[in-house]
């Protein structure tokens, strides 16, 4: 899954049908180049500043490569992880109401009626330091 997600994220900027492993090490050892790390940092907004973080990423890619090697031909996709049980859906009762203001009060940070989530492990600037978003 990781390798597929990384490959999909890298496919367009790197020029088409090149796979992720071709941009790492040609032998597929899981080693990652500095250019790929910089690209992933921009895409995921995650800082890979330490060797430990890069090693963790390499382990995740190696695990994804092992998963890719699993032969799934002829295996039907599962609808549920609990195949021996029936999953009952609750009745969905729609309740109309304009409660956006109440919902936004539950958030620690709000910008122009949107929730603000911290991007990965890079801390957000303080609200006073942020520039307002341009209106389109």
Curated annotation (Swiss-Prot):
List, in alphabetical order, the GO biological process terms annotated in this UniProt record. Answer: glutaminyl-tRNAGln biosynthesis via transamidation; mitochondrial translation; regulation of translational fidelity
Q: What is its main location?
A: mitochondrion
GO cellular component terms given for this protein: glutamyl-tRNA(Gln) amidotransferase complex; mitochondrion
Q: Entry's SUPFAM superfamilies?
A: Glu-tRNAGln amidotransferase C subunit
- According to its UniProt record, where is this protein located? Mitochondrion
**Catalyzes what?**
L-glutamyl-tRNA(Gln) + L-glutamine + ATP + H2O = L-glutaminyl-tRNA(Gln) + L-glutamate + ADP + phosphate + H(+)
Q: Which InterPro entries does the UniProt entry name for this protein?
A: Asp/Glu-ADT_sf_sub_c, GatC
Does the record's keyword annotation contain Ligase? yes
Q: Say if the entry is tagged with keyword Protein biosynthesis.
A: yes
Any GO molecular function: glutaminyl-tRNA synthase (glutamine-hydrolyzing) activity
Q: Which UniProt keywords apply?
A: ATP-binding, Disease variant, Ligase, Mitochondrion, Nucleotide-binding, Primary mitochondrial disease, Protein biosynthesis
Q: What is its EC number?
A: 6.3.5.-
Major enzyme class: ligase
Instruction: State the protein's purpose.
Output: Allows the formation of correctly charged Gln-tRNA(Gln) through the transamidation of misacylated Glu-tRNA(Gln) in the mitochondria. The reaction takes place in the presence of glutamine and ATP through an activated gamma-phospho-Glu-tRNA(Gln).
What the entry lists under PANTHER family is as follows:
GLUTAMYL-TRNA(GLN) AMIDOTRANSFERASE SUBUNIT C, MITOCHONDRIAL
- Disease per record: Combined oxidative phosphorylation deficiency 42: An autosomal recessive mitochondrial disorder characterized by onset in the first months of life, cardiomyopathy, respiratory insufficiency, lactic acidosis, anemia, and variable impairment of mitochondrial respiratory complexes I, III, and IV. Death occurs in infancy.
Which miscellaneous remark does the UniProt record hold? This protein may be expected to contain an N-terminal transit peptide but none has been predicted.
Write out the similarity annotation: Belongs to the GatC family.
What quaternary arrangement does the UniProt entry report?
Subunit of the heterotrimeric GatCAB amidotransferase (AdT) complex, composed of A (QRSL1), B (GATB) and C (GATC) subunits.
Name by which UniProt lists this protein: Glutamyl-tRNA(Gln) amidotransferase subunit C, mitochondrial
Identify the species of origin.
Homo sapiens (Human)
Organism classification, top ranks? Answer: Eukaryota, Metazoa, Chordata, Craniata, Vertebrata
Tell me the name of the encoding gene. Answer: GATC
């Amino acid at each position: 899954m990781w390798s597929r997600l990384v490959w999909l994220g890298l496919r367009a900027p790197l020029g088409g049908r090149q796979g992720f492993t071709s941009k790492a090490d040609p032998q597929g050892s899981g080693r990652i180049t500095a250019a790929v790390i910089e690209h992933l940092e921009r895409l995921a907004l995650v800082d890979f500043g330490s060797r430990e973080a890069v090693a963790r990423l390499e382990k995740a890619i190696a695990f994804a490569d092992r998963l890719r090697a699993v032969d799934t031909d002829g295996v039907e996709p599962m609808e549920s992880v609990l195949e021996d049980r029936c999953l009952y859906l609750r009745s969905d009762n729609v309740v109309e109401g304009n409660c956006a203001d109440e919902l936004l009060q539950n958030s620690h940070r709000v910008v122009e009626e949107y929730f603000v989530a911290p991007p990965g492990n890079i801390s957000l600037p303080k609200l006073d330091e942020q520039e307002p978003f341009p209106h389109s």
